[in-house]
Design a protein with these regions (language model features):
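Regulatory N- and C-terminal appendages and interdomain linkers associated
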Residues: 2-186
């Protein structure tokens, strides 16, 4: 609070004013971000349900969110784009939701290629997965080998550009690779 104002009362008021508008601002940003991930020009009535149903289904099916959103972008214009279908496919449980999504996007004003490009920009193919970060740190720390770290940094410099030759970096960890405690203690 002292950074906001020397007067504690004024600082508290200023901080509270920011806190008061946060929920609304968060909702606006969330809706815009989710619209991009779903390939929608904007959120309309029912889109919040479409989004929340997808997230619930992904959680229920224990789906990797990163791969699922990338695969959804592939489906925006099948047979084109960066296609990660061999890395991930939706289970049959997603069929009804995908039908709803197809119906919703068919009425959107943008072309399939515009939709797909927007979705790719909103959903990285590669993220700094804990098991990859830990392996890179261990390699550097134990062996003095910074090559895995440098490769990961290079890859994450362009996380939205899927490259088949680097597909191994897109996979979630196998059970034996799950990191239960990171170097920072989380």
């Amino acid at each position: 609070l002292p950074l906001l104002d020397k007067d504690t009362g004024q600082a508290t008021e200023r901080a509270q004013a920011v806190i008061d508008v946060f929920p609304e601002q968060y909702q606006v940003e969330y809706r815009q971000g989710m619209a991009r991930k779903l390939g929608l020009a904007g959120f309309e009535d029912g889109d919040e349900v479409l989004a929340s149903d997808l997230l619930a289904l992904m959680a229920q099916e224990r789906t990797d969110f990163t791969l699922a959103f990338r695969r959804l972008a592939d489906l925006a214009q099948p047979g084109t784009g960066q296609q990660i279908g061999e890395l991930f496919e939706f289970s049959d449980a997603f069929t009804p939701w995908l039908q709803r999504w197809n119906q919703r996007t068919s009425g959107d004003p943008q072309s399939a290629s515009e939709r797909q490009a927007m979705m790719y920009r909103a959903s990285p193919a590669f993220i700094p997965r804990n098991h990859l970060v830990e392996a890179a740190i261990n390699s550097a720390e134990a062996d003095g080998d910074y090559a895995p770290f440098n490769q990961l940094v290079d890859l994450l410099g362009q996380p939205h550009d899927f490259r088949q030759d680097l597909a191994r970096f897109a996979y979630p960890p196998r059970p034996d690779q799950v990191v239960t405690q990171t170097f920072c203690g989380t």
